From Swiss-Prot:
Family affiliation: Belongs to the thiolase-like superfamily. Thiolase family.
Annotated protein name in UniProt: 3-ketoacyl-CoA thiolase A, peroxisomal
Active-site feature positions: C123 (acyl-thioester intermediate), H377 (proton acceptor), C408 (proton acceptor)
Tissue-level expression: Mainly expressed in liver and intestine.
GO MF annotation terms: acetyl-CoA C-acetyltransferase activity; acetyl-CoA C-acyltransferase activity; acetyl-CoA C-myristoyltransferase activity
Functional description taken from the UniProt entry: Responsible for the thiolytic cleavage of straight chain 3-keto fatty acyl-CoAs (3-oxoacyl-CoAs). Plays an important role in fatty acid peroxisomal beta-oxidation. Catalyzes the cleavage of short, medium, long, and very long straight chain 3-oxoacyl-CoAs.
Length: 424
């Protein structure tokens, strides 16, 4: 109820004093390791391909998913039959990709005795898969499991909400669930005063950070090169290997961004340059109970400290992280100042800027390797991809630290998770 009052008060333009949204003095506390901790053992991802134009435009999602499932198991030398469960986030495939994901499991050599489910919480599906596997570990259903996300936006259609009752006309919030995502971005920009200049500044920074990270090889440890077949303009098959993200544009300039026309509304501020890219990709994260990881001699890349999902108004769904992040931090007993890296999905620059400003997050802590504006946003994959990128970057830095993964969710939600990197 308090959160609802805070959200409604902010939407009405009233000042609020919720301490959960304020950056408090640094109070980082690293808890003692517990045998029951849910730990991240390892994670890999495919490169992110440009939908309909990139190297994965003809690659089916089961092949993308199989690539990361196989790589994670091989990297840590885990026997596939030791998995207790697999959860796969997917948005666009029929039935959240339930059949596709089970096929990918078998293509990866994982036996039928290992169960699998899929989940669709839209843009947070990959992170929800992580939470689902963590929940199974915590409740004792199993000790080790795989959380994944996958999306082929090249091969799957968007925009059909399915069979909807005509009674949605009776509810404003129900109608708002059908607001096009681009229009929710325009709503955020207008309602909260996020200028075109701020959006383009944020987009340029994302491209520059991603280009720098790519040139320095920062993604090399997390990316699984994928050899696949692509059809050229003449319809001829060609075998290629995709080994790096395709959406990064090192030549991006403010002048170039400023020339782009509004994509969703005349006189609007959301453009193709300050929005996330339509993309293809997959990611997989291996989780375990700490005691099981130690028993099997598996590495520990991180510890899941908290997870939260919140609801916000559907027509400004992009503000979700501004409310999910404080909820996750509170569960972990932490503040904004305790976090070294915030991986906040850049669905649109408008909503990302709003969330960063609302929470008072220093710019240098936000998406240090770039985000979805530069890297791309394969819907079901993104949450799992962010976990892999976050923990690998914390590992590169070497010291014990906390990081946050968060994203907005279509129809009006936000999700966030807090991870601890244990230090080299």
């Amino acid at each position: 109820m308090h959160r609802l009052q805070v959200v409604l008060g902010h939407l009405a333009g009233r000042p609020e004093s919720s301490s959960a949204l304020q950056a408090a003095p640094c109070s980082a506390r690293f808890p003692q390791a517990s045998a029951s901790d849910v730990v991240v053992v390892h994670g890999r991802r495919t490169p992110i391909g440009r939908a309909s134009r990139g190297g994965f435009k003809n690659t089916t999602p089961d092949e993308l998913l199989s690539a990361v499932l196989t790589a994670v198991l091989q990297d840590v030398r885990l026997k596939p039959e030791q998995l207790g469960d697999i959860s796969v986030g997917n948005v666009l495939e029929p039935g959240a990709g339930a059949v596709m994901a089970r096929i990918a499991q078998f293509l990866s050599g994982i036996p039928e005795t290992v169960p699998l489910s899929t989940v669709n919480r839209q843009c947070s599906s990959g992170l929800q898969a992580v939470a689902n596997i963590a929940g199974g570990i915590r409740n004792g259903s199993y000790d080790i499991g795989m959380a994944c996300g996958v999306e082929s936006m090249s091969l799957s259609g968007m925009g059909n909400p399915g069979n909807i009752s005509s009674r949605l006309l009776e509810s404003e919030k129900a109608r708002d669930c059908l607001t096009p995502m681009g229009m929710t971005s325009e709503n955020v920009a207008e309602r909260f005063g996020i200028s075109r200049q701020k959006q383009d500044d944020f987009a340029l920074a994302s491209q520059q950070k991603a280009a720098s990270a790519q040139s320095r090889g920062c993604f090399r440890a997390e990316i699984v090169p994928v050899t696949t077949t692509v059809l050229d303009d003449k319809g001829d098959k060609k075998t290629i290997t995709v080994s790096q993200d395709e959406g990064v544009r090192p030549s991006t300039t403010m002048q170039g961004l400023a020339k782009l026309k509004p994509a969703f509304k005349d006189g609007g501020s959301t453009t193709a340059g300050n929005s996330s890219q339509v993309s293809d990709g997959a990611a997989a994260v291996l989780l375990a109970r700490r005691s099981k990881a130690e028993e099997l001699g598996l590495p520990i890349l991180g510890v899941l400290r908290s997870y939260a999902v919140v609801g916000v108004p559907p027509d400004v769904m992009g503000i979700g992280p501004a409310y999910a992040i404080p909820a996750a931090l509170q569960k972990a007993g932490l503040t904004v100042n305790d976090i070294d890296i915030f991986e906040i999905n850049e669905a649109f620059a408008s909503q990302a800027v709003y969330c960063v400003e609302k929470l008072g997050i220093p710019a240098e802590k936000v998406n240090p390797l770039g985000g979805a504006i530069a890297l791309g946003h394969p819907l079901g994959c993104t949450g799992a991809r962010q976990v892999v990128t976050l923990l690998n970057e914390l590992k590169r830095r070497g010291r014990r630290a906390y990081g946050v993964v968060s994203m907005c969710i279509g129809t009006g939600m936000g999700a966030a998770a807090v991870f601890e990197y244990p230090g080299n």
